[in-house]
Structure formats: structure tokens, C-alpha cells
Amino acid sequence: MAGLLQIRDALALHGNVQALQLSRQLAAPLPLVQAMLERLIAMGKVERIEQDNSACLSGSCKSCPEGQKCSSTVVYRLK
């Protein structure tokens, strides 16, 4: 089972990481990873960043059927 230290180490290694990526990397359930990230945020060790993807490089995101889902991405990083 993944612990707070493994989450912290993965963030240190990879920089900005989505919770789903951490979940897959650590083979831990996504709700568990999200809860641990929230705990690390409360401890002042991690920050949550909402990235705006509206400036798509190809310019085709507005017509993309997946466009609504990827309008913003939440990533986490160490403080």
C-alpha cells in the first residue's frame, strides 16, 4: 500500500503530477491517493495547481468531443 512518503517521493521525482498518474504508478486506488494528497496539502507539503488547457497548441480543442473534459487539469507538486 502506498503511503505519504511514497506520494511525496513520486512528486519529488516527477514534479507536476496528476493524481491518476500517481495512482497508476503506485498501484494504489485513486480515492486513496487523492486523500493522501489532501493530507499533504493540509500539512503544507504539497500544492494543488489547476492548469488551464484553453490555450491548446493545435487550436482544435474547442471542436473536440473531449474538449469539455480537458478544459482544466489538476496537478500536484511539492512546495
Curated annotation (Swiss-Prot):
Domain of life: Bacteria
One term of GO molecular function: iron-sulfur cluster binding
Annotated Gene3D superfamilies: Winged helix-like DNA-binding domain superfamily/Winged helix DNA-binding domain
SUPFAM superfamilies attached to this UniProt entry: Winged helix' DNA-binding domain (SSF46785)
Any one Pfam family match given in the protein's UniProt record, by short name: FeoC
Binding site residues for iron-sulfur cluster: C56, C61, C64, C70
Annotated family: Belongs to the FeoC family.
Function: May function as a transcriptional regulator that controls feoABC expression.
Name of the protein: Probable [Fe-S]-dependent transcriptional repressor
